[in-house]
Amino acid sequence: MKSLHWFLHLLIIAFTVLRSVEAQNQAGFISLDCGLVPKETTYTEKSTNITYKSDVDYIDSGLVGKINDAYKTQFQQQVWAVRSFPVGQRNCYNVNLTANNKYLIRGTFVYGNYDGLNQFPSFDLHIGPNKWSSVKILGVTNTSMHEIIHVVPQDSLEVCLVKTGPTTPFISSLEVRPLNNESYLTQSGSLMLFARVYFPSSSSSFIRYDEDIHDRVWNSFTDDETVWISTDLPIDTSNSYDMPQSVMKTAAVPKNASEPWLLWWTLDENTAQSYVYMHFAEVQNLTANETREFNITYNGGLRWFSYLRPPNLSISTIFNPRAVSSSNGIFNFTFAMTGNSTLPPLLNALEIYTVVDILQLETNKDEVSAMMNIKETYGLSKKISWQGDPCAPQLYRWEGLNCSYPDSEGSRIISLNLNGSELTGSITSDISKLTLLTVLDLSNNDLSGDIPTFFAEMKSLKLINLSGNPNLNLTAIPDSLQQRVNSKSLTLILGENLTLTPKKESKKVPMVAIAASVAGVFALLVILAIFFVIKRKNVKAHKSPGPPPLVTPGIVKSETRSSNPSIITRERKITYPEVLKMTNNFERVLGKGGFGTVYHGNLDGAEVAVKMLSHSSAQGYKEFKAEVELLLRVHHRHLVGLVGYCDDGDNLALIYEYMANGDLRENMSGKRGGNVLTWENRMQIAVEAAQGLEYLHNGCRPPMVHRDVKTTNILLNERCGAKLADFGLSRSFPIDGECHVSTVVAGTPGYLDPEYYRTNWLSEKSDVYSFGVVLLEIVTNQPVIDKTRERPHINDWVGFMLTKGDIKSIVDPKLMGDYDTNGAWKIVELALACVNPSSNRRPTMAHVVMELNDCVALENARRQGSEEMYSMGSVDYSLSSTSDFAPGAR
């Protein structure tokens, strides 16, 4: 056994070495020494082995300089030079990256009296069109480091320095590092670093590349009230954060083990929203009678994570799935031993970020690309304002451009004025990519060649001014362009006194126009007469008894779409263009299924989930009708609510309330990267899902059978409240008489009632069977069907394991024993009753809800007894702003 233990550690060492070797090539790194000259110069910084190069290929403006020689020995080489921007309000670096990927972007600023003025600058940093941070230099040798984790929406990124006062913006270095997309998850916005610390066992400065393959800068933290523990053995750091070995091999624990440990900090902005990432690994070899288990709460007892046991020599990363805030900017985190613990809490590393809201959308990417090409083609880099995003923000729009700013999509260019811009050569085809352009002024330049035909294809274009270009061929106007002029949809100015006009038509045209006008007046009178007749009839109709119901009860039987008025409810019907707007052209995918794809949306300021029917779905429209019919007439706090629906031509969509925490299966498996669901969470989710299902059976008239109950159809909101979803297969059954309905079998393998499958007779007990399978998943966190098991189906596997009389052998090991044993037995027995092969011997959902409430009560009693064991004293230390941690010394 001992040899196996060491063999596993050797594997971890080998993996770590491979990752280290792989990291040496700095793949994806962009490391710019700003102001470095000449252009060809590159070098490797000795203390980090990072290769830096000049920034000249990434920016068109600025002056180069160097910090005072007296200060150079205090800093790494990449901050010896600076690039400053005395001209222009906004100056931007343009970096080519991979769209929709996550990057760490870091700007470093060391003044070093480079200009001899001894004036400490202050200015703003922008990421694309959005403000990132404010830079305030506090001293000649103070290092100001600003870092953000950002998902780039396009294949290029602008990092801009914006002048906000009398002083001149400058930058020393700009670094971009790729990250795993699965790391640092947020609901929205980007992450600006506040602090990133680790707890070394000996005095140390900071850690970065090549110990950290992503070149994150880890600052050491020491405190009089804390002691440090460490290990020489390797740590398994194989999660999406790729934590450095040197960071995870050490940890801090409070000196006074009997008292809770208080960790606090104050954000620079009181109302800032924050994400906190804590990294844990057990670095001590615990004996059989030693246990390290603790709870984490924050800001007065709000639960962060319960019953945490750091895994032995293996990483566990805990973070909040949504942003948290504090009214005064102060955050207090308390780490307290549980009653089962013999050892104090530990913490290996901590990262704190504030949210940068990305509210300003970037200009349409095709138009940005076109403008960059136009800028390069005509050598327009000398235009001071032509930096960063062409349109956004509006305050810094490029000179000569006018833009439109739609609410839900990126800005668009609607006019381009390059009058007198010293343009030479032919008219570039990149102009044709500005598809919403209405006005184009290329006058008073030295353009040559023919007038391009693509002008005629630009449907939005209303005015073109080509005057003052003596070498432009104005004699050959393309026929298609002449037709646009003839139709008066376009004005073409060719010279100072020459505007291309429509070719003259026959003299009969005025008579035709007069006749058309008379006919138009007559038609208008006829329409008005018809309108008043219809209006009078409508008034009479409204005096009759109340209107017919908007929704026909029961199941819609017809499969012909044109004959289904029963699902048309004007108050909730949404058009396809509205769907496009609310989803931002289907930008963010939440999930995919047999029905189609589910997208994130925003309707009237509220988040929604938009499920689009796939055109390839054979039974999709039938299920669509069934789900609309059901959801328009049922309302329950534990059923996902229907906000609206779209039935617009071939486009079908269901718009639901948004469930921020995804489905139960994702949360059980850990795919969402959040905390392990506690036993208390699981019991509450089971009760709430059962209540929703019980309502369908007993609260609806006629009663409903869901037919597809499974963990992926139980959705969780931001508070982990459960709601039953996906009613596309639901069926009603009679109130009186027979309690079964004969129907074609439908459902999901593994959850499907075998009696229903065998007989085609559907009843509410079919849902009870499926829910029993869900309960077994909740308890065991095992797949429903696993062919590698001796008994593949979860029902059979649990029954077999229970013959040994040990409930612990089937309960999810991620719970680490943190559950009420009596409650676990009770819920497993209930689940096995639900999956009885005979439907007559299964309980009703009303009985299931009652039994589950008993399980919740048992768990609550256990929790209250455990929490009384917490000590009330505290040990605390604080974290200050990231500026105090900035690494500058070599």
Curated annotation (Swiss-Prot):
What EC number(s) does its UniProt record assign? 2.7.11.1
Q: Supply the alphabetized keyword list.
A: ATP-binding, Glycoprotein, Kinase, Leucine-rich repeat, Membrane, Nucleotide-binding, Phosphoprotein, Receptor, Repeat, Serine/threonine-protein kinase, Signal, Transferase, Transmembrane, Transmembrane helix
Q: Which GO terms describe its molecular function?
A: ATP binding; protein serine kinase activity; protein serine/threonine kinase activity
According to the UniProt record, list the residues that bear Phosphoserine: 742
Catalytic residue list? 708 (proton acceptor)
Q: Which Gene3D superfamilies does the entry link to?
A: Phosphorylase Kinase, domain 1, Ribonuclease Inhibitor, Transferase(Phosphotransferase) domain 1
Superkingdom is Eukaryota
Reaction it catalyzes? L-seryl-[protein] + ATP = O-phospho-L-seryl-[protein] + ADP + H(+); L-threonyl-[protein] + ATP = O-phospho-L-threonyl-[protein] + ADP + H(+)
Residues carrying a glycan:
49, 96, 142, 181, 256, 285, 289, 295, 312, 332, 340, 402, 419, 465, 473, 497
Sites bearing Phosphothreonine, chain numbering: 575, 743, 748
Identify the InterPro entries for this entry. Answer: Kinase-like_dom_sf (IPR011009), Leu-rich_rpt (IPR001611), LRR_dom_sf (IPR032675), Malectin-like_Carb-bd_dom (IPR024788), Prot_kinase_dom (IPR000719), Protein_kinase_ATP_BS (IPR017441), Ser-Thr/Tyr_kinase_cat_dom (IPR001245), Ser/Thr_kinase_AS (IPR008271)
What's a GO cellular component annotated to this UniProt protein? membrane
The stretch of residues making up the signal peptide is 1-23
> Phosphotyrosine (modified residue): where?
656, 756
Residues forming the Protein kinase domain are 584-856
Residue spans, topological domain Cytoplasmic: 535-890
UniProt subcellular location: Membrane
Record keyword Metal-binding present: no
Those parts of the protein on the Extracellular side are: 24-513
Q: Which SUPFAM superfamilies match?
A: L domain-like, Protein kinase-like (PK-like)
- Regions that span the bilayer: 514-534
Family per similarity comment: Belongs to the protein kinase superfamily. Ser/Thr protein kinase family.
Protein name stated in the entry: Probable LRR receptor-like serine/threonine-protein kinase At1g51860
